[in-house]
């Protein structure tokens, strides 16, 4: 049982951890390409090695998410969370003193693996929250995700202007502070009687995804997560290049637009989600969010003026509710002893989408880059994302209708 003091500290710790996790990623976005450039002799080599590091981070995150989730089911959430922050601190601080490309690749592998511990943070929230309150709590985490996404690139750009390695020093220091805070304050959320033995089969990313798909009613939702995650990461891959080519935006405009995405996430998931859940169930909210996101991606692709990109960002409020709603449904489908494995598999699936997105989005944009900026086909990556969101919508609606039909049939049998 979590002590009152520990219970009060638990959710703020996880929220702070999420902010730091996103800030640590955002801090290095403006400076990592330039840091890689210090070790390469040409722009082509710089682009290649930056791609290698992006792939290494995503691959390590994909492989580590189910392992850390299964470890947390066996040994508790607290030690795995603290291990993750320790590893993150080491990887960031090691970057400060890196003197060769292979060292940068190595620390990105470690960083990707250790940042997979945020799936354990989701499991921690599921442990301490009743099922009917999880969507709101996951929404709060989403708001912290957005806040970190606002602060990270801004702070990273300012620090990087002083020294390219200074953002890594700042990120490592934040991770160390969170490690110390968690060590002295954070209680364990998973009692011994709810733990289960660690098995490598459960920690295998492919097996964990298969196990996730076997949860009652979850298989279509796995496809929903894959589609929405891939669309999101394709957007992140193409946004800057797309807006630069189509509207002539520079770093300032792109920085403000990405900050706007984070602001919407904070407003919706931190302030509005709780109110929305009073009116709509997580399933209904997920459907409304997918409708909104489908339209938003299509409008981003068709936008003819830069201000339209901002207008759609702020119009797509419901789109920011999808992840929290679906995570809540997945969490409710898993039993109390499998939260870490289930949510670790969700994290691993998102990491896999992050690996695939550059290989899909960049070639799509390159294929239409010869067209004049006013040509509607320039928005091809965003139209692709709209199709992904529409597919997710069809899958979700079909699954929720089947659930209602089963409940109706069960109610009919019970009334006889």
Question: Where are the regions that the model predicts?
Answer:
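Juxtamembrane intracellular "pre-TM" segments in multi-pass secondary transporters
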Residues: 1-8, 187-224, 246, 413-416
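A membrane-interface helix-boundary motif in multi-pass transporters
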Residues: 160-173, 365-389
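C-terminal transmembrane helical hairpin of 12-TM major facilitator-type secondary transporters
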Residues: 283-326
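Conserved MFS/SLC helix-loop-helix module at the cytosolic interface between two early adjacent transmembrane helices
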Residues: 62-101
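Cytoplasmic helix-loop-helix junction between adjacent transmembrane helices
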Residues: 107-146
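Short amphipathic helix-loop junctions that connect adjacent transmembrane helices
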Residues: 31-47, 237-254
């Amino acid at each position: 049982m979590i002590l009152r003091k520990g219970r009060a500290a638990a959710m703020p710790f996880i929220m702070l951890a999420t902010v730091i996790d996103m800030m640590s990623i955002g801090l290095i976005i403006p400076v990592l390409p330039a840091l890689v450039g210090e070790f390469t002799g040409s722009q082509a080599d710089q682009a290649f090695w930056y791609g290698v590091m992006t792939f290494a981070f995503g691959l390590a995150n994909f492989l580590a998410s189910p392992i850390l989730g299964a470890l947390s089911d066996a040994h508790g959430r607290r030690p795995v969370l603290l291990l993750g922050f320790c590893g993150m601190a080491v990887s960031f601080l090691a970057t400060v003193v890196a003197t060769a490309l292979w060292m940068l690749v190595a620390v990105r592998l470690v960083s990707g693996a250790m940042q997979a511990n945020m799936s354990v943070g989701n499991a921690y929230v599921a442990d301490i929250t009743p099922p009917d309150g999880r969507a709101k709590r996951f929404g709060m985490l989403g708001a912290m995700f957005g806040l970190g996404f606002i602060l990270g690139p801004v702070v990273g750009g300012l620090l990087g202007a002083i020294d390219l390695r200074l953002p890594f020093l700042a990120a490592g220091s934040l991770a160390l502070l969170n490690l110390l805070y968690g060590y002295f304050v954070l209680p364990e959320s998973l009692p011994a009687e709810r733990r289960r033995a660690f098995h490598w089969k459960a920690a295998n990313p492919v097996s964990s995804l298969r196990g996730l798909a076997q949860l009652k009613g979850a298989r279509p939702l796995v496809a929903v997560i894959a589609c929405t995650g891939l669309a999101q990461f394709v957007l992140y891959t193409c946004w800057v290049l797309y807006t630069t080519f189509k509207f002539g935006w520079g770093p300032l405009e792109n920085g403000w637009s990405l900050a706007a995405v984070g602001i919407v996430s904070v407003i919706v998931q931190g302030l509005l989600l709780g109110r929305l859940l009073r009116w709509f169930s997580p399933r209904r909210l997920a459907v409304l969010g997918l409708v909104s996101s489908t339209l938003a991606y299509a409008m981003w692709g068709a936008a003819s003026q830069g201000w339209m990109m901002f207008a759609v960002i702020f119009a797509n409020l419901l789109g920011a509710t999808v992840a929290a709603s679906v995570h809540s449904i997945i969490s409710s489908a898993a039993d109390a002893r499998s939260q870490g494995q289930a949510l670790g598999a969700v994290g691993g699936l998102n990491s896999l989408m992050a690996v695939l997105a550059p290989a899909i989005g960049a070639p799509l944009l390159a294929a239409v880059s010869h067209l004049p900026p006013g040509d509607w086909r320039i928005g091809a990556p965003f139209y692709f994302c709209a199709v992904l969101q529409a597919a997710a919508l069809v899958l979700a609606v079909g699954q929720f209708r089947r659930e209602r039909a089963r409940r109706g049939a069960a109610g009919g049998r019970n009334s006889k």
